[in-house]
Amino acid sequence: MAIVRAHLKIYGRVQGVGFRWSMQREARKLGVNGWVRNLPDGSVEAVLEGDEERVEALIGWAHQGPPLARVTRVEVKWEQPKGEKGFRIVG
C-alpha cells in the first residue's frame, strides 16, 4: 500500500457551491488526509495524502465535484508525503 501526496488546483465554478465541504466529506469517507481551500482567483486548492488508490478516487471525484459545481480543469502535481493528519478546510 503506497502512500502518496497529490497537490490539486481545481478550476471552474468551484466556489460558493459547497465544493470544500463536499470534498472534506468525501475525503473522510475514503480515509484520505489533507486540506482544501478557496483561492483569490476563484479556484480551489487541495492537498490529498493517503493510499494511492483512495487518493486517485478522490481526484476522480474532484473532476466532477458536488452537484452545483462545474469543474473545467484539474491540475495534479505529485509530491513527497508529509504525514498529513485528518482532512480540514483551511483559509
Curated annotation (Swiss-Prot):
UniProt xrefs under InterPro entries: Acylphosphatase, Acylphosphatase-like_dom, Acylphosphatase-like_dom_sf, Acylphosphatase_CS
Keyword Hydrolase: yes
Pfam family, one: Acylphosphatase
Keywords assigned: Hydrolase
Enzyme class: hydrolase
Active site as annotated: R20, N38
Enzyme Commission number, as recorded: 3.6.1.7
UniProt domain Acylphosphatase-like: residue ranges: 5-91
Gene3D superfamilies, A to Z: 3.30.70.100
Hydrolase as UniProt keyword: yes
Reaction(s) the record says it catalyses: an acyl phosphate + H2O = a carboxylate + phosphate + H(+)
Temperature dependence comment: Optimum temperature is 98 degrees Celsius. Poorly active at 25 degrees Celsius. Thermostable up to 100 degrees Celsius.
GO MF annotations in UniProt: acylphosphatase activity; hydrolase activity
pH dependence: Optimum pH is 5.3 at 25 degrees Celsius.
Protein origin, superkingdom: Archaea
Assembly and oligomerization: Monomer.
PANTHER family per UniProt: ACYLPHOSPHATASE
Family indicated by similarity: Belongs to the acylphosphatase family.
UniProt-recorded name of the protein: Acylphosphatase
Organism: Pyrococcus horikoshii (strain ATCC 700860 / DSM 12428 / JCM 9974 / NBRC 100139 / OT-3)
Taxonomic lineage: Archaea, Methanobacteriati, Methanobacteriota, Thermococci, Thermococcales
Gene name of this polypeptide: acyP
